[in-house]
Amino acid sequence: MGSSPLDRERRCLVFGDESVSLTPLEYGVLTRLVDAEGSVVTRDELLADVWGQPFGGSNKVDVLMRSLRRKLGPCAGSVETVTGHGYRFSGWPQSK
């Protein structure tokens, strides 16, 4: 696995000299996925764990994932959509 751009102390992403801020929800979703260590996290689990809402039926997760992937830039592929199930963090890309 590659080096993590996630700075947990500052709650941001760091790419070289550039720092990319994360909203509290983006940070919550990303750390939930990273901490799941490759396991699938369902939309309902994200809603319950990050938003504190125990039910689905919302596009909140989809909207946030689009924003988070934009901010992840070259690491966007690290967050995989598992169709019909949820999302999985596949690891940070290897540095070249």
Language-model features: where?
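Minor-groove-contacting beta-hairpin "wing" of winged helix-turn-helix DNA-binding domains
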Residues: 79-90
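Positively charged, aromatic-enriched patches within helix-turn-helix-type DNA-binding elements
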Residues: 12, 17-24, 28-64, 70-76, ...
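A structural micro-motif at secondary-structure boundaries
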Residues: 1-27, 88-96
